[in-house]
Every structure is written in C-alpha cells, then in structure tokens.
Amino acid sequence: MAAVRTASLLCGLLALLALCPEGSPQTVLTDDEIQEFLEGFLSEFETQSPPREDDVEAQPLPEPTQRARKSKAGGKPRADAEAPPEKNKDKEKKGKKDKGPKAAKHLEGSTRPTKKPKEKPPKATKKPKEKPPKATKKPKEKPPKATKKPKEKPPKATKRPSAGKRFSTVAPLETPERSLTSPSNPGTRELPEERGRTSLNTWQGQGEETQVEARQHRPEPEEETEMPTLDYNDQIEREDYEDFEYIRRQKQPRPTPSRKRIWPEPPEEKTQEPEERKEVDPPLKPLLPPDYGDGYLIPNYDDLDYYFPHPPPQKPDVGQEVDEEKEELKKPKKEGSSPKEDTEDKWAAEKNKDHKAGPRKGEELEEEWGPVEKIKCPPIGMESHRIEDNQIRASSMLRHGLGAQRGRLNMQAGANEDDYYDGAWCAEDESQTQWIEVDTRRTTRFTGVITQGRDSSIHDDFVTTFFVGFSNDSQTWVMYTNGYEEMTFHGNVDKDTPVLSELPEPVVARFIRIYPLTWNGSLCMRLEVLGCPVTPVYSYYAQNEVVTTDSLDFRHHSYKDMRQLMKVVNEECPTITRTYSLGKSSRGLKIYAMEISDNPGEHELGEPEFRYTAGMHGNEVLGRELLLLLMQYLCHEYRDGNPRVRNLVQDTRIHLVPSLNPDGYEVAAQMGSEFGNWALGLWTEEGFDIFEDFPDLNSVLWAAEEKKWVPYRVPNNNLPIPERYLSPDATVSTEVRAIISWMEKNPFVLGANLNGGERLVSYPYDMARTPSQEQLLAAALAAARGEDEDEVSEAQETPDHAIFRWLAISFASAHLTMTEPYRGGCQAQDYTSGMGIVNGAKWNPRSGTFNDFSYLHTNCLELSIYLGCDKFPHESELPREWENNKEALLTFMEQVHRGIKGVVTDEQGIPIANATISVSGINHGVKTASGGDYWRILNPGEYRVTAHAEGYTSSAKICNVDYDIGATQCNFILARSNWKRIREILAMNGNRPILRVDPSRPMTPQQRRLQQRRLRYRLRMREQMRLRRLNSTTGPATSPTPALTLPPSPTPGSTSRLWEILPTTAAGWEESETETYTEVVTEFETEYGPDLEVEELEEEEEEEEEMDTGLTFPVTTVETYTVNFGDF
C-alpha cells in the first residue's frame, strides 16, 4: 500500500508541475504548497513505516529560506536557526513566491551567505525520490556555516562599498529587507540574465537532475578559491600599485569560505579549512581586493543603502573587524622578509585601514579630490623684448610715445616725457572699452599677468582693476570667469611696484587681452604675461636660437649659494683656481673674486691680467649668473682639454668678481624676478651707486689740458687721486674703496663690467666734456655749412678711441643678438645704429664712472657691457642667455693679447718700474709694472713706441701689430743719463738758467778780482768737503727738508701723486750723493770760508749789480755748485 501511495503522490506532483507555466513556475507551485503537500502524505507514510533520522531531518526544510531572509534584513542567523518551524512557515508564505529560487541562483555564482539557503527549496523536491535524507542533512549542516561566516563578512561589506552596491541590485522590490551590511563576495554579477537563470535552475531541480547539478557545483568553490590569485584585474593592479602587491595577493583566498557555504560539505573539512586559512587569511581581511567578474562594472545607485547601514548587525561586526585588524599587525608577514620590510608592511596595512567601518583608505585616496599643483610658467618676453613691438596691440593710444609698444614691464621714460619714448601705454580716452592685447604667435598656456603703472616723475597713473580675455583668432574673445560672472583682477596700488595676478586655472590660447576697469589718474599701464608655450614658435628669429649643451648650474644663486659654487669650482680645479676677497660691503658681506690661471696667486712676468666684474647694481643679476657659469665652463673645459680654454688660462691671469654689491642683490632677490622695480637693489646699503661713485679725474685732466700743462706738468696717464677722496670722512662707499685698492694692487690690462637694462657695449669717456668757445664756434660754422660736428664729438672721445671701438665691436659682433638692428633699443631709440656699440658720453653722460677712472688712473681699458633689456631674467632664460653671451665673453678675453708687450730694463738687466710707454699719435701712455713688464693694447698697424724713465735716456723703436691674436714683443733697454743731475743743479739755482762766462770777453780789474776770490773760495770749500768726508763716520744720511730739496720737475713722471713723490725723490738722492748735498746745506747754515767774510762778499755782489757786466750768484748757489763739482 505504501508503494501505491508513493506512486500516486509522484503522479500528482508531476501533474501539478505540468500545469505550471514555463515562464513563472514559482507563482503556480510555491514552496509552501509543496511543503503542505509533502507533510500531508508523509504523515500517512510515517504511520506505516518506522521513522528515520533522514526523514525527521527533512521536516525543517523551509528553515534555510527563512535564515536567508533574516540575514538580508539584518537579523542574526543563529537566532533563525533556533526559531520554531511554525514561524518559519509563516515567513515562507510571505516571501518565497519569487525571491527563493532567484537567490539560489545567485548563491551558486557568489560567496554571499544570505543567498545560500535559498537553494534548499528545490532540493526539497528530491525527497519524494527517496533522497530526502541527503537534502535534510545538507541544510542542517549549512545553517551553522551561515551563522559563523556572515559575522566575519559584514566587516568586508563595510570596507567595500562597491560590493554592497552590487547586491542591492538583485532584489529592488525588497530593499528594506535586503539592504545587506555584509556582502561576502563583491565580485558577483547581478544581471537580469542571472535572475532568469536562477528560475530555470529551480525548475530543472526535479528528479535526479538536481543531484547531478549539485555534484557538479561542488567542485566549483574549490576552483574559485584559486581564481582570485590569478585574477586579471588584480594583475593590473599589482603593476600600477606595487606597494600593495603583497597584501592584495594574500587576501584573495578569503572569498572561498563564503562560496563553500552554498554546498554541503562534511563538518570536518570545514573545521580544517578555517584553521589553515587562519594562518594566512586573517591578516589579509582588511585589504580584500574587489572581484569584478568578467569585467562588468556594477552601477553605483545603491550608495544610500550602503552608507546608512543598519545599526543592529553592524555594531558587533565593527568591533570584531577592528579587533581583527589590530591582531593582524601582530602576525608575521612574508617568510624571509627583513625587519625593515615588516615594519613597512605594518604601516602600509595601517594606512589602508578605515577604523570607521567604511571603505579602505587606499580607495578613498583614489576617489577623493586633491589640490593640483599650480603650473609655474616663465614670462613670455615682454620685458626682455622677445615679444616684438608688432605683437602688442591696443584699442587706442594717447600719442605715439605712449603707444602699445611702450606697455612693457619696467619700461623707462626718456629725459623728456613728451617725446616718442614715454614710460607706459596710455589710452586715448577713459572709457571702459579700452584694451591692450599680446599675440604670442603660438598656442600658450597662460597662468598670470604682472601689471605696473606708468614710469613718470610728473604723473601718477596706474590701473587698479581689470578683466582678462582670451582668443585664438583675435576675433572671438572669451572672458575669464569665476563660474558665475567675469572675474575681476586687482591691479596696482602705486606706479612702480609690479603686482602679480594669477589665474586660478590656466587657459590655453594664443591671444591675451587686458580690459582695464578702474584706474588712478590716466588710463596707463605696463604689463608682463606669464605663460608656457604649447606649440613651437613661429617667430622668424626665435627659430635660430640655439639650445645649450653645457652641463652647468642654470639657476639663480643667493649669497651662500654663490660662495658654495665658487668653493666647488675651486675644489674641482684646484691647480688653476683661487678664491679671495676684495674687501667687505657695508653690511659686512665679503666681495668674493676667483682667479683662474695656471699659476694662481702670483703675477707672472709677461702675463697680462684680465678682469670681469658684475653686480655693481644689485638688481642686474644676469651678469652675476653669467660669471658663475663662466667659472664652471672654464674649469670643465680645461679639464676636458679644450685647446682654446687651455691657451687662455695658461697665458692670462683672469679675475672674475660676480657680485660687487652683495647687499643690493639680497634686497632684489627677496622680491625675485619680475617683481622688483627698476631701482630696487640698485644702490648699496649706504645709498651709493657704485658705478658713478669713483673720483672724477676727467675734470682734472681737462683743466690741465686747457692750461697746456699736459704732459709736462700733469701726466696724461696714472693721474693721482685728489685728496678729498682719500680722507676718512670722504663720501665714498665702502665697496668703492675696496675696488680702488684692488685695482692698484694688480696691473690689469683689460676689463669689462657686466650690467643690465640695455643691449649694447659702452666705452669711455662716460663724462661729457663741455666744449670750449672755439669748439662751439667751429661747430656752429660746420652746422651752417651742413657738415658734421666733428669737433664737438671729438671732445667726448679718448685718445684710444679707435682701440675702444675695436674692443667693443669684438664683443658685440660675437654676441648672438646684440647686433641685430630690427630689435631696436630697450628703453628708447637705438643709439648704436645697429652696431651694438656706443660712446658713453653720447648715450648716457655721467661723471665719476668706473670706466673713466680705470682709464685715467690705471693702465686698464674698461668697458661697460649691457647684456639685455631684462635686468633680472627668469631662471628659465639663463640657458638661452648663456648661449648668447658665451662666445662673446671668450672673444673679449682674448683681446688682451692684441697689441704690444715687453720688458723695460737698464744696461745691467735690472727691470725698471714705473717707466712710461708712449705711442706716437696717442696722447695716453702706460706704466710698467713692478717687474718692468708692460702691455699696450693696439689695433693692427705700425707704431713708433718710446720708453722713458727718470734718470734714463729714452729709447724708441718701431713695433708692428698683426691682425692675429698675439701681442708683439717690444723690449727696451735704457741707459743712465745725467739729466737727473742737471735737474738737481737747476733746482739748486732756483730753476733759473746758469749763464756761461765767455773767457775771451774783456773784463775790468774789478771783475777779475771778484772772479779770483770766487775761485779761491771754491778751492777752500773743496778741501773742506774732502776732509769732512774722510772724517765723517759711515751711516745713513739724513734726508733733506722738503722745502729745500723738493724741486718741481718738468717731466711727466715727476708730477705723479704728491704723497708718493716725496719718498721717491728722497730715495733717489740718497742713492746718488746725498752726503755731499747734506754737508753743503749744513755748512751753509753754520759756517763760511775762513778767509772770506760775508760782508766783503755782499759788497762785491752789490758792486756787480751796479756794473751789470758781471754775473750775480746767490750764496746758496755758489756753495752748492762748489760742493757738487768737488765730488768729481
């Protein structure tokens, strides 16, 4: 009977299943109906057959579905396992219609514990086929798994927001019940196709096919445990994030336990697996990588469900998660890892934790917005004139002198502000429709604008606010906005200080336009634009700009950096370099110099000395940096064996002084490039302009020339410094005193000072000479005839005018951009006429300059080199400027070997110091150094050169100068002469001529008697002098008093410095006949001849005066004359 009943039951079930439609089998036959149907027939079957353990266990089949729902709703799985079957049945009736089978399918492809119990309803259908014990055993073993592991995985859900978001898409109809807080596998795919598949799997769960599928699904979790370590997405993450590679690889096996919950396994295996995983998996929990499946990206539309978790299940989970994470730091890391790696792994794990039960910190950093570093771009070249005049346009201009081309930063007005060269761009009217634009001729990323007011001593004009617009075609303009309206930029508060207005976000365009809104005074402004070029430049001249290949330190150097760099160069090339100090500045900073020579520290005979100075004005920084680069270049090239540099170093003693005004540089460097005005840092700390603070020797020389004292009474070279500049209270800067002392110690031949603000070479004279009345008259007549004013222009020229022009052209022609006529002048018109050279007095007349003082006080020919329009260029401009000036700097140094050189000695080969070397046709000589050597720079040609010294006979010879580099050797040997004695005799006679007595001329008896007395007196004086010389003890003679022994000398060399003439003259007399002269003076003051009385001698002299036919000799002259002749 039991077999018949079972057969009838099976037939009934098949009939019911056949009536169910294929599209919705769950709606026709629900689990509750199947449960009631089975219980009804099984109760009858149990009365006839003895109860089995499997049958008893088959009764709580609906419990897994109830647990799954509770886990979705946030309940505790253990409490569901202990719930009575009656309550479970009620819950099954409410929610098992559609969601049970669908969840079961998801559980097959995922590791989430909540979905696993939903596969049990189709397994319940296996019981009529005598396989209910298998179905009953499996759900009983699964509930404890579901209760143990959901507690461990809620923390994973808190760490991975993406996993929680994906699960909510599975059942949108029951979101309040399915809002999971612990999704176990974030990589499950929840597609509509999967939902359909789950329903099909539940329908196929009839008969033995369900057992086959269950068996087929059993090995899947084992394979899935290995898959995370070979995930393709994880491999990509390891390449991008190498720091997290070790942690991510070990944390991937974690999804395996959740997947194994779905399939029934013996409890022994389950207990073994967590033990093995505890050794490896627990430290990997907090950094479990997301599993994206086949690459499908789940949409993030369930953020609210995740970020507002349910409090009941999360509170215990969060605590467990934090405790587990704290324990993970104490667990060992990789095998064989060093202690340093272990500490780094611990910190990496701590950084990636989120102690607030949220997503990992590593993921937050990827998603969070961080401030982007601002792009710092250099100026496009408004101030440096790399932007040409035709690239600057404006809506209007007040007049040509205030046009758009004058709107460059730091543009200076001329002496007359009403001319064509004023100090800003000014609009024609004061309407707000005015603008000024710049065409960069390339696509540029603009980052800011620097504005400045008008340079004027009368007006106070500057722009206070403005708009900025951009365009690519100069037709359609886009205004810069702040997101709501056009952004207003604030400009200047005075006319001199530059103000930077940065753009919050860079803009890429070709044109930039400034629209002034408000201003002070008139609408006038100067500006500079900051931008980085995006596309190559189309300017015809910029295409030829070379790029440096030298490995040098291209950056601005502070005082400490400069000192450190010079120290490094000295250490790299100790055999050819030496660092020393000229003195100190007003603030106590040392003025450093570097000597480069094959024998540093010593002056070699025949080797000329050259100097480069820079930084006289602290804000003119380009020269300072070029000299620092030149130091490095000479050192590197000398070590590399560059023959040109080696010859230059071996034959020349080079002195480089990068900063003569370190105090001024520190002031200018605080503001930085482009932000200091024209005069900031120009003066010293005491307020002096070093270039114009030297003694004025031009006025002294020109006054002597007007009196015809040159070269007899006043020399034309090596003029002494006036006393007013030497007194301690003189208004001379500390730096100038140190420079003068340095110039007098070293016999410099050629030098140049590097400046900024213009692009030209200036040569002396720098002081304008007032023309005389005759010159003015001649100039007026020449102008009336239409001729050039040659006489007036010649008044500003030095005797070495042709040589100075040669030297200036040698630098300007070697410079890459100085002789380009289309560039024009920086501040005003081009005074050089495209040649790059100009006379200082014609261009910018000044008195007391460094160039004029060096030319008149020493042998050094000094020029001023103005390197560029921008005094303080941006750091990015240094490589370009180095290439523009490198060849010119080397070429100018080589000019020191042009001309003649030699040594002046006497007949015994002893060098003669302070000998004068003069060239016929050039009214300017040079002096020999302490070793008797000299250098005279001359243009190619043939010259008659004369060497003369005091006490020696002059010597002259013809010297030829070639075009090639290399001075012609011209040595002189001077013989001693009696001219020194003759000048002494004349001085003793009061510098009056000594008349010669003709013996053939008849004399009166009285004259003869007087002559005899004089002869007797001379004889007696001679005898007395001889006796005194024999009786006198040997020893140094006393020097004569200056009033009696210092005669005026008609030679050029005798009127040198007054403070040096006295000791020099005394020393010369001591070497010759000082004793004799001293004896005579003493005798004159104390005693006279024994046989001749003074009264008689005076009477005789009176008689001679009356007769007018004899000679009248003063008493002193007679005594001196007699003593001198007595020495022969």
UniProtKB/Swiss-Prot annotation:
Residues 547-977 are annotated as: Interaction with PTEN. Residues 1030-1044 have a biased composition (Low complexity). Residues 382-547 are annotated as: Required for DNA-binding and interaction with NFKBIA. Residues 1-25 form the signal peptide. One of its GO terms (biological process) is proteolysis. Residues 555-896 form the Peptidase M14 domain. It comes from the Eukaryota. Residues 933-1128 are annotated as: Required for transcriptional repression. As a positive regulator of collagen fibrillogenesis, it is probably involved in the organization and remodeling of the extracellular matrix. May positively regulate MAP-kinase activity in adipocytes, leading to enhanced adipocyte proliferation and reduced adipocyte differentiation. May also positively regulate NF-kappa-B activity in macrophages by promoting the phosphorylation and subsequent degradation of I-kappa-B-alpha (NFKBIA), leading to enhanced macrophage inflammatory responsiveness. Can act as a transcriptional repressor. Residues 113-163, 249-261 have a biased composition (Basic residues). Interacts with different types of collagen, including collagens I, III, and V. Interacts with GNG5, NFKBIA, MAPK1, MAPK3 and PTEN. May interact with calmodulin. Interaction with MAPK1 may stimulate DNA-binding. Binds to DNA in vitro. One of its GO terms (molecular function) is collagen binding. Residues 375-532 form the F5/8 type C domain. SUPFAM superfamilies: Carboxypeptidase regulatory domain-like (SSF49464), Galactose-binding domain-like (SSF49785), Zn-dependent exopeptidases (SSF53187). Residues 77-109, 267-282, 327-363 have a biased composition (Basic and acidic residues). Glycans are attached at N520. The keyword Signal applies. Keywords: Calmodulin-binding, DNA-binding, Glycoprotein, Repressor, Secreted, Signal, Transcription, Transcription regulation. Expressed in aorta. This is Adipocyte enhancer-binding protein 1. Residues 413-616, 998-1128 are annotated as: Interaction with MAPK1 and MAPK3. It is found in: Secreted. Residues 40-368, 1027-1056 are annotated as: Disordered. Phosphorylated by MAPK1 in vitro. GO terms for cellular component: extracellular region. The gene is Aebp1. Belongs to the peptidase M14 family.
